[in-house]
């Protein structure tokens, strides 16, 4: 942080403090590819509204510039490239008062407890039951009028007004109750609660141990082992429709079928967790590269399984994400996997489920070798749940969302998906050949006073359970701007694929005006796999 003197206060919505582990490039240290890079690329390539001036300056400064994702895809391990913008490496550098807002169904939420705990400057935070959206226009419901809180925050720091915002506890958290699995929900049951900050002193870790009979209990079992065959195309449901750790995920049973699964007995009373659950595992693999994925879920009495938390781990990062090392086949080693920030109340009569797998495709790029992994039970393999004993706490009195201002000539056109991003629309599998295909789509648009802007995107992921090294993602993104007497089209086409040793990147940018091709440029690169 540069902390310029004129910067008096910050509000960060859906932010991260770690661009390597906790962003959309290498989630949990594992390669992730989605449609976002194409939409962002075309936004960067085109000139600004309302003139959309197409000239040599635009070509030089925007359209002809090398796609920045080509640089990112070469940075496959943590290190200096990511350190430049990682607040997590230097919390003391943030000296400006900051207000952090996140959502339980957004991929950017882990920074909230870390910043509350580590930043010395004034910090306030809230996290609610919404996705990657502003809280006044949330999905899912309920929302709240965060703009009122923003005015209170800025009035205090910019105008010196006594708004009372610093008299309140620092952390407002929405505690989630059970809901059925997604992918689409009208709303989430729960309640708001004030907490003084983070960590919360009354939270206690409860250890649960996977057992040889696939039970999850308070008692550590004798030593034994469970083996799991790697199915590279599994995990679609665990990744959710947008394919990241921020979705209302599907019923977890299809992914659980390819996982090691451990369940508690039905709970005798409600159990609340709040924090970052941890999985401490002793594992081994018979291949030099393997990823592990852990998920915590709620099994309802009717058998449906709702994902509560999860995380992935690149096994070659077991000692360091900066200096990865191949796995020594057959040799057990410990993993500590911190799941992503969560809140949940497991209801009486429900079961807690812990699942371990080696694939979460297409959210995470598959490792290239066929293999079998082993989970060694006993000897410290366990799950730590951050449990919260009941304590009567004050509740925030947030205002309900208010209608936003209606700007003349501005209208958001209907989007295909609730998230506004490409979501899984079809899944195809061929058991005979091992081939699998997942297609994600979205479309929408905005009407402006100067014209109409529309977009359409399609992303096709393919892999093969018999040869996961040969995995690919093919995407297309099309933006159309309709002006009076003029139609502009920007197109981006990406083919990203892998073999055992390398990634292959080909990207084409295209501009058309009134149906005629104005400019087209293609970039290609061959990138060594760096422990991915």
Regions found by a protein language model. Name each.
Residues 2-7, 25-31, 114-119, 140-145, ...:
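Short secondary-structure boundary/capping segments
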Residues 2-93:
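Accessory cap/linker subdomain of secreted extracellular hydrolases
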Residues 3, 92-94, 119, 199-202:
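Extracellular/periplasmic catalytic domains that process cell-envelope and extracellular macromolecules
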Residues 6-9, 119-140:
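Catalytic cores of eukaryotic secretory-pathway lumenal/extracellular enzymes that build
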Residues 20, 108-109, 362:
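Glycine/Thr-rich phosphate-binding loops of Rossmann-like dinucleotide-binding domains
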Residues 67-127:
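Serine-hydrolase catalytic core
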Residues 104-105, 130-131, 359:
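Acidic beta-to-alpha connecting loop that harbors the catalytic carboxylate
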Residues 126, 134-136, 140-512, 516-532:
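C-terminal, loop-rich substrate-recognition/catalytic regions characterized by aromatic stacking residues
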């Amino acid at each position: 942080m540069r902390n310029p003197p004129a910067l008096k206060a910050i509000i960060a919505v859906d932010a991260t403090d770690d661009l390597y582990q906790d962003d959309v490039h290498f989630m949990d240290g594992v390669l992730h590819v989605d449609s976002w890079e194409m939409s962002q690329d075309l936004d960067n390539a085109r000139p600004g509204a309302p003139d959309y001036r197409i000239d040599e300056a635009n070509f030089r400064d925007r359209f002809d510039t090398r796609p920045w994702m080509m640089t990112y895809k070469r940075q496959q391990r943590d290190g200096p490239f990511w350190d430049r913008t990682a607040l997590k490496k230097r919390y003391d550098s943030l000296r400006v008062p900051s207000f952090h807002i996140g959502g339980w169904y957004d991929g950017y939420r882990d920074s909230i407890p870390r910043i509350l705990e580590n930043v010395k400057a004034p910090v306030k935070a809230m996290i609610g039951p919404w996705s990657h959206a502003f809280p006044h226009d949330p999905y899912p419901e309920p929302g709240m009028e965060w703009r009122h809180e923003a005015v209170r925050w800025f009035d205090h720091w910019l105008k010196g007004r006594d708004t009372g915002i610093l008299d309140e506890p620092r952390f407002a958290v929405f505690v989630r109750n059970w809901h059925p699995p997604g992918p689409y929900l009208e709303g989430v049951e729960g309640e708001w609660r004030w907490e003084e900050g983070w960590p919360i002193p009354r939270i206690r870790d409860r250890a649960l141990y996977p057992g040889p009979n696939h039970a999850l209990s308070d008692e550590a079992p004798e030593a034994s082992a469970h083996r799991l065959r790697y199915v590279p195309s599994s995990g679609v449901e665990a990744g959710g429709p947008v394919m990241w750790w921020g979705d209302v995920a599907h019923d977890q049973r299809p992914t659980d079928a390819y996982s090691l699964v451990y369940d508690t007995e039905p709970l005798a009373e409600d159990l609340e967790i709040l924090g970052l659950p941890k999985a401490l595992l002793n594992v081994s693999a018979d291949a030099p590269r393997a990823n592990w994925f852990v998920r915590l879920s709620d099994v309802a009495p009717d058998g449906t399984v709702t994902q509560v938390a999860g995380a992935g781990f690149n096994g070659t990062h077991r000692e360091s994400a900066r200096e990865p090392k191949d796995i020594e086949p057959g040799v057990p080693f410990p993993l500590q996997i911190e799941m992503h920030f969560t809140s949940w109340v497991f209801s009486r009569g429900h079961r807690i489920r812990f699942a371990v797998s080696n694939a979460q495709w297409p959210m995470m790029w598959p490792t290239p070798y066929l293999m079998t992994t082993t989970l060694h039970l006993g000897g410290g393999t366990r799950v730590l749940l951050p449990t919260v004993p009941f304590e009567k706490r004050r509740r925030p009195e947030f205002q309900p969302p208010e209608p936003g201002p209606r700007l003349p000539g501005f209208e958001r056109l209907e989007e295909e998906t609730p998230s506004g991003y490409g979501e899984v629309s079809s899944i195809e599998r061929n058991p005979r050949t091992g081939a699998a295909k997942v297609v994600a789509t979205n479309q929408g648009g905005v009407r402006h006073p100067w014209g109409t802007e529309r977009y359409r995107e399609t992303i096709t992921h393919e892999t093969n359970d018999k040869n996961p090294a040969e995995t690919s993602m093919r995407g297309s993104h099309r933006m159309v701007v309709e002006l009076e007497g003029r139609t502009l089209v920007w197109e981006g086409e990406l083919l990203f694929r892998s073999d055992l040793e390398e990634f292959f990147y080909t990207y084409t940018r295209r501009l058309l005006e009134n149906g005629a091709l104005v400019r087209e440029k293609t970039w290609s690169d061959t990138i060594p796999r760096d422990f991915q």
